[in-house]
Amino acid sequence: MSFHDLHHQGVPFVLPNAWDVPSALAYLAEGFTAIGTTSFGVSSSGGHPDGHRATRGANIALAAALAPLQCYVSVDIEDGYSDEPDAIADYVAQLSTAGINIEDSSAEKLIDPALAAAKIVAIKQRNPEVFVNARVDTYWLRQHADTTSTIQRALRYVDAGADGVFVPLANDPDELAELTRNIPCPVNTLPVPGLTIADLGELGVARVSTGSVPYSAGLYAAAHAARAVSDGEQLPRSVPYAELQARLVDYENRTSTT
């Protein structure tokens, strides 16, 4: 089954988002066959805020590090780190991944949808096999956060060649159903509080990305593990050291032969 096919199964597939090799290996150990990256996790772990075009080089390095894994990889490239469509297309070619996420906002503001569409056109012309997931940030930024504006933007991106549309924080079931009815390609969401994967499937959602939830949960768990040690409390569950080490040894052996 191709990465494109995963979006047409009739039920949503879950795409966990990694920020480094160990997180990706953890997802593989759980049986996931496709892994995305989280721009927040990558930027945050490097000491940078999200969305500030600070992870261009880090994403190239991460894509290369994940390439030997037996799974599909999709990379979140924020807004493409540029306003020049051809430069973004060249950047995507360097990643050599099954898919990418590109958002229609920059510096926490929506950009002209014509520019966002031009970026998609350039990416698909240069990389026709790459699954382009066009992120519409209307709900995320609470700017023009309504179905009409969101659908208008989404249709421009589909016409430009987008293979999927990502609408983070579009959490109202009725609005989600309207979006999936009117956007003629697979629609991607983040987890929606109170709705199961099956519920989202009934609303027409094709893909559910974990986003930065696992990264944030990891930070929470790390802080509370340290507090448990300090307070003399029972330590939380964790992956055994030996298992983590074995994963990394296997990864190192695999990469040394590629």
From Swiss-Prot:
Q: Name one Pfam family in it.
A: PEP_mutase
What's the domain of life for this entry? Bacteria
Signal peptide (residue range): none
Q: Which GO terms describe its molecular function?
A: catalytic activity
> Could you tell me which cysteines form disulfide bridges?
none
Q: Which InterPro entries match?
A: ICL/PEPM, Pyrv/PenolPyrv_kinase-like_dom, Pyrv_kinase-like_dom_sf
Induction text: A member of the dormancy regulon. Induced in response to reduced oxygen tension (hypoxia) and low levels of nitric oxide (NO).
Name recorded for this polypeptide:
Uncharacterized protein MT2054
